[in-house]
């Protein structure tokens, strides 16, 4: 996670879990507050600087196709260290974050790497039973909400791994 949610990226600790939920505003699966479904769950395993991320995760950089008109969306590694001033970054061309988002993205200071994740998608999110739903923000937040005991919820997600569109389950 290298873009958006700067406060969450600054404050999240290694070992924390991050969950993405449907919402009223999600065009493909709008859901009412209190009825949100799980889009993804990911365990933070590393916090890297943007420079470290740039060097270690070349495969997460968007690239132009052969006709140089279309950019293939491979990921969020869009901030290249400035060779003349390594504390500054150059935003590479991409299809999802304009220059107007750069300051906000870089305020996050870190990129969160999640080596264990479960992606259900916004088109087929996972329904979580009421008794094990974690704390979910009522409105969009930049920092998230902490759930003290999320073990039952995490185990439920792991038991439904066959419904994932993509996973790197451990």
Please place each PLM-identified region on the residue numbering.
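Short, solvent-exposed loop/turn segments at secondary-structure junctions
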Residues: 24-26, 47-49, 124-125
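A sequence-composition feature that detects small, non-aromatic residues
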Residues: 2, 7, 19, 42, ...
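Short N-terminal edge-element motif at the start of the domain
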Residues: 1-33
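Contiguous surface segments at macromolecular interaction interfaces
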Residues: 52-170
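Short beta-strand-centered aromatic/proline hotspots
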Residues: 29-31, 36-47
């Amino acid at each position: 996670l290298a873009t958006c949610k700067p406060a969450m990226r600054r404050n999240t600790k290694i070992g924390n879990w991050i969950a993405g939920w449907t919402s009223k505003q999600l065009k493909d699966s709008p859901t009412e507050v209190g009825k949100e479904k799980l889009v993804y769950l990911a365990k933070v395993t590393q916090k890297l600087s943007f420079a470290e991320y740039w060097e270690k995760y070349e495969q997460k950089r968007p690239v132009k196709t052969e006709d140089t008109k279309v950019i293939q969306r491979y990921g969020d590694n869009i901030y290249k260290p400035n060779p003349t001033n390594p504390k500054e970054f150059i935003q590479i061309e991409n299809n999802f974050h304009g220059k107007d988002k750069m300051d906000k993205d870089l305020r996050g200071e870190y990129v969160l790497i999640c080596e264990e994740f479960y992606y259900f998608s916004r088109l087929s999110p996972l329904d979580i039973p009421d008794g094990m739903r974690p704390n979910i923000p009522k409105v969009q937040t930049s920092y998230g909400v902490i759930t003290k005991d999320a073990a039952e919820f995490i185990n439920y997600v792991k038991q439904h791994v066959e419904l994932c569109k993509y996973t790197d389950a451990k």
